[in-house]
């Protein structure tokens, strides 16, 4: 199938995302790992497409994202980039590929040459020098804080972050430090909704939430989760958008609409402190 985009749809750039955030217009983001789904998401009006290392879970059947390699991320980025026309395409730097600023830059260059327009890194304020190094060298960055799946063993499992006073204070420091280092987007995962809303208000850049409440600038889900086709455990923050829909396209459009009108995430998809 060939998707004919609305000719009025403009290419989504970092300044466009910032303008959406400033205007209070919600940003819809989903994952895609191949050309066909990237084309469909773009056609349905998704502003950001993430080639996530979650492909380790939903494409490879891994229990964690840790086994995913840079070469695999580059391959899937190339595939998704061929299908995407206007959405902003970002790609995860996989586990172990950004221990130093220089290593992070080399890894990011590989992904940018494969078609990524931004890279995503997981971590806290300790990442600031790496983010600064990348941004100074024209690599756009999305900083991922809160529950960082690459740290699953260090965190003791997939647990909500920022529930204690100390944990909340650390997330506030993380967000501000990463913004100051130059991150153009901050993604928060599994963070109490009130805290995520507070952090969003404290930042000048857009925030994207996954299990972080409705007050973030936008939302993201793993495509296979929101289509209810992943056989693993369903996280609390996931909603089945295929329910009652006649097609995958309709489900994706329902997701975009729900993000835009603020009906997703609802209270049952969020966490409290």
Curated annotation (Swiss-Prot):
Of which family is this protein a member? Belongs to the PanB family.
Q: Which keywords describe this protein according to UniProt?
A: Cytoplasm, Magnesium, Metal-binding, Pantothenate biosynthesis, Transferase
**Gene Ontology biological process terms from the UniProt entry:** pantothenate biosynthetic process
Which sequence ranges are marked TM in the entry?
none
Q: What is its main location?
A: cytoplasm
Q: Which CDD domains match?
A: KPHMT-like (cd06557)
Residue positions annotated to bind 3-methyl-2-oxobutanoate are 53-54, 92, 120
Q: Could you confirm whether the keyword Ubl conjugation appears in this record? A: no
What reaction does this enzyme carry out catalytically? Answer: 3-methyl-2-oxobutanoate + (6R)-5,10-methylene-5,6,7,8-tetrahydrofolate + H2O = 2-dehydropantoate + (6S)-5,6,7,8-tetrahydrofolate
Pfam families reported in the protein's UniProt record: Pantoate_transf (PF02548)
Positions contributing to Mg(2+) binding: 53, 92, 122
Active-site residues are 189
**GO cellular component terms, semicolon-separated:** cytoplasm
NCBIfam families tied to this protein: panB, PRK00311.1
Query: Which Enzyme Commission number(s) are on file for it?
Result: 2.1.2.11
The pathway where this protein functions is: Cofactor biosynthesis; (R)-pantothenate biosynthesis; (R)-pantoate from 3-methyl-2-oxobutanoate: step 1/2
- Cofactor note text: Binds 1 Mg(2+) ion per subunit.
**Assembly:** Homodecamer; pentamer of dimers.
Organism encoding this protein: Cupriavidus taiwanensis (strain DSM 17343 / BCRC 17206 / CCUG 44338 / CIP 107171 / LMG 19424 / R1) (Ralstonia taiwanensis (strain LMG 19424))
The protein's name is 3-methyl-2-oxobutanoate hydroxymethyltransferase
Q: Which InterPro entries match?
A: Pantoate_hydroxy_MeTrfase (IPR003700), Pyrv/PenolPyrv_kinase-like_dom (IPR015813), Pyrv_kinase-like_dom_sf (IPR040442)
The top EC class is: transferase
Q: Does the keyword Oxidoreductase apply?
A: no
Gene that encodes the chain:
panB
């Amino acid at each position: 199938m060939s998707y004919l985009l609305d000719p009025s749809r403009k290419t989504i750039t970092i300044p466009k995302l910032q303008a959406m955030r400033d205007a209070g217009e919600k940003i819809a983001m989903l994952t895609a790992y191949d050309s066909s789904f990237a084309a469909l998401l773009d056609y349905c009006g998704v502003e950001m497409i993430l080639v996530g290392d979650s492909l380790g879970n939903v494409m490879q059947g891994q229990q964690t994202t840790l086994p995913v390699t840079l070469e695999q991320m580059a391959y899937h980025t190339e595939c998704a980039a061929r299908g995407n026309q206007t959405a902003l395409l970002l790609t995860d730097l996989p586990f172990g590929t950004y221990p130093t600023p220089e290593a992070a830059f080399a890894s990011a260059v590989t992904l940018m040459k494969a078609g990524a327009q931004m890279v995503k890194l997981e971590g806290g304020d300790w990442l600031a020098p790496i983010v600064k190094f990348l941004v100074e060298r024209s690599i756009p960055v999305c900083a991922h804080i809160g529950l960082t799946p690459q740290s699953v063993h260090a965190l003791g499992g997939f647990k909500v972050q920022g529930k204690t006073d100390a944990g909340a204070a650390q997330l506030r420091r993380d967000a501000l430090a990463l913004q100051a280092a130059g991150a153009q987007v901050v993604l928060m995962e599994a963070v109490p909704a009130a805290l995520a809303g507070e952090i969003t208000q404290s930042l000048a850049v857009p925030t994207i939430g996954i299990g972080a409440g409705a007050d973030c600038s936008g939302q993201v889900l793993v495509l296979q989760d929101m289509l209810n086709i992943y056989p693993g455990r369903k996280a609390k923050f996931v909603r089945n958008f295929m329910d009652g829909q006649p097609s995958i396209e309709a489900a994706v459009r329902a997701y975009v609409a729900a993000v835009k009108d603020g009906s997703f995430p609802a209270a049952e998809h969020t966490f409290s402190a």
